[in-house]
């Protein structure tokens, strides 16, 4: 959050609201005077939650949607409706370790670097145009918990930089690639 706040602080923008499928950050968000909406997702019927998210985004006239800790795959309709306006932070150096539990996957593969990727959301999971990435070195002696801890710091910085680039209109998307000026 600190990195994201630094990114926002110097920009002519505001956080319209926080929509979360977790209720654990409500008090912190509301302490900052930001509207908070808890929209739980029923695994058997996700459509009502996605409809509510879309309604809230429209109600608050949000220009960009940031997915952080959301861990849900957006339906194709939302991906199309908000194309180029939904940014995700994924906790791996994409295209490696797509989807859930990338640190577990990285540990099983014995990688020497873990990372984070900030990208635009598309219908294909974790395959949208990449805005920003970074890595940190790990060793064979690091546990999955160590990797998660190291990765959190990288994720914050990558998201902050990626969001800043987007807000400054520095990202040119060409097909599935980006050029960041």
Which ranges hold each PLM region?
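Short, small-residue-biased leader/transition segments that mark boundaries at the very start
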Residues: 1-2, 6-8
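Adenosine-nucleotide cofactor-binding segment
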Residues: 30-62
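Short, conserved loop/helix-junction motifs that constitute active-site signature segments
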Residues: 9-12, 80-82
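Donor/substrate-binding cores of folate-linked one-carbon enzymes
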Residues: 21-22, 32, 49, 63-181
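Short internal beta-strands
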Residues: 12-24
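Acyltransferase donor/substrate-recognition loop-hinge adjacent to the catalytic core
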Residues: 27
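Short hydrophobic/aromatic-enriched beta-strand-loop microsegments
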Residues: 13-16, 36-40, 85-90
């Amino acid at each position: 959050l600190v990195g994201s706040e630094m990114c926002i602080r110097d920009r002519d923008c505001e956080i319209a609201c926080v929509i979360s499928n977790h209720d654990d950050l409500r008090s912190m968000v509301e302490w900052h005077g930001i509207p908070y909406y808890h929209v739980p997702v029923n695994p058997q019927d996700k459509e009502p939650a996605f409809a509510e998210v879309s309604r809230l985004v429209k109600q608050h006239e949000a220009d960009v949607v940031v997915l952080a800790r959301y861990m849900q795959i957006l339906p194709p309709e939302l991906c199309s409706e908000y194309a180029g306006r939904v940014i995700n932070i994924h906790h791996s150096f994409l295209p490696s370790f797509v989807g859930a539990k990338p640190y577990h996957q990285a540990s099983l593969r014995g990688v020497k670097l873990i990372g984070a990727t900030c990208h635009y959301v598309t219908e294909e999971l974790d395959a949208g145009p990449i805005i920003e990435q970074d890595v940190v070195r790990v060793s064979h002696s690091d546990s999955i918990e160590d990797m998660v801890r190291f990765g959190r710091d990288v994720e914050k910085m990558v998201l902050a930089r990626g969001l800043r680039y987007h807000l400054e209109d520095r990202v040119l998307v060409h097909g599935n690639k980006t050029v960041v000026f």
